[in-house]
């Protein structure tokens, strides 16, 4: 296992290729509890679904990318994809999300990933995203951990469980 407070990269399933072979995304984690095999995600993923920065995960088998989500951090994962260079959009969107406590986790030439706590409010987050993207018709945003990974449309509702605590 990974010693506590140690940072490392672990493979997470990101999808499958045209031949049905798995594709993995390497994600940064820090060990939380070596004995129980618990790690915490340091950044929201670009492709791996149903996860966000700060989520606590139990490592079942790192070699085969088997994990179990133990506890959600309350962060939403927001993925922005662009058909063109992302820099102009990033210069607009990043400060707008930072104003409502969002954080840029990943910047790629055609994608951005942000984390923001759900308590900010879905409407405020979505309004901020839509306002920033209105001048960039070649870009689109998605939540990475709000919808069922199987159908991509059914809200999971994990934030309701946190609200009840």
Which residues make up each language-model segment?
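Extended boundary segments
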Residues: 1-21
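Short beta-strand-centered aromatic/proline hotspots
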Residues: 23-31, 44, 64
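Short, structured beta-strand/loop micro-motifs enriched in basic residues and often containing a Trp
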Residues: 33-43
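Short, charged beta-turn/beta-strand-edge "cap" motif at the junction between a beta-strand
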Residues: 45-47, 60-67
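Short glycine-/aliphatic-rich beta-strand segments at the starts of folded cytosolic domains
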Residues: 70-84, 112
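Helix-rich terminal scaffold detector
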Residues: 86-165
